[in-house]
């Protein structure tokens, strides 16, 4: 959990726990995940305490992912490759996005508007995970239109101007 900086013994134990996700990803032995780091929480205002310590003085331990790796992970989740079907339905629900305009208006952080799903027909089904922070606008989207095969798209952008561009990804 987050909190103030820790003494060295507790900090080392905390780091081991935080790195477990990276150990699991490494154990998959997928080339798309080489050099990935998914051990950091995301922050609106920046990390503090032990989280800031863990990022490193120059943020050298920040999260680092790729579009290829994100595509592989998301497809594997959606096709039940890495988590058996009965066990990942809850996870899929977390990624499910409503395309209904009324529902989207009620949720300003809906991860559809300003992202890949915004341009889809309302009859489609969408599962996605957007990332929007001060310098990145990312999206991983899996959708299925009626009577069509599922589609997957992954877009990562970097730059303060692109972060503000609400029309870049839905285009």
What are these language model-derived features?
Residues 62-67, 71-171:
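Structured C-terminal helix/loop/strand segments within mature extracytoplasmic catalytic/sensor domains
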